[in-house]
């Protein structure tokens, strides 16, 4: 393993390597030849966007734009493949190439170390993974580290699913449940979360190749998976059935709207008397065998998180479990799909998470105390005590304390950092300017390739002062009879809501 750093020195690009070699040149062919020569073992840097910045600075604006748009450009005999925030690959040919990965993603709390210490940190990861038989081919991300293992599972993909069903479920992607029910400041809140929510659902998914998928006007009794299209009508204070308007904005409304429901969703409506559904047609999977191809692997990775591993390796386990879900909806820049795309699995995971939350609220009569829902957790008003579990898919208390809720996407609580602002910072901002409706703080961020195209090419790879912040909004995803007009009002009053009416929304898609 070798670690690298880069900079501009006397108008030349200087690359330093932990093997005590290096180069300083203004000739790109020489530079790339040096980098391509570093093929043996892993090549790592602290931050790949910082590492690549000196190279980007000497490219033409057209070359930078081409690289930004396609992720790939050719310069002389060499090809550059740059996956922003992930990896850099320099090649002369497919086999004659060198890749560079960043490890800051696994050491998020650490300051940038020395070149030698970067190498040590990388070796810690590789050594610990090797002890449990994991020998990654690349370090692009947590999921990439486990790619060989996931590839060996031979999972069902979109190619095994009727095209029309793929269209139905692909259209439902990105509907995680994020909703604020009350706005204001709350002195004591309890945050309940599901341990590894998405992975717990993923572990129990069936391989639909073992059975038949039928399209009909009725649902077969023997069906285990159902994707029912029809007219949904709900009137509850909350609903797990998320709706997207023509602009892709998400709502959980009451009233009638078109929807696609799973079998679990249909059962939820019936068990909790939560609404009605007029069936138009459905795709149903009738199994001949109930096989869970991810069950063993997901449970094994989850259990390894509690082992005697360093913090970065535990972060890799967690990232791999959560990240594999994204592969089921993976689409590349050129429109091609990832090899593990499976939109019915993606749909069942998101849908299952929403229904787990809704069922927990119903079973524990928590409706009146819901403050916010955020994908796999519930923020409740008050000091709640439950028996926290460490098992995958079960509930735990994540944290307790005060919260400030500005909107569905802006909930300041504990160590959460919406808009790059912590709870205590948000409170200080509003207390200093209680009559304001917008607040900002000073911060720094890295100037990236996208910024270069906006005239910031000279600052590429450097830190630039910015002003992240938040503001009161007056267009919410729920109906608020009254809204705070100033920060002071937000701190001193509670603003309850009701579900927005589906009839007021634009046609769903």
Per-region residue spans from a language model:
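Conserved acidic
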Residues: 24-509
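Gly/Thr-rich phosphate-binding beta-strand-loop-beta motif of the actin/hexokinase/Hsp70
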Residues: 1-22, 196-199
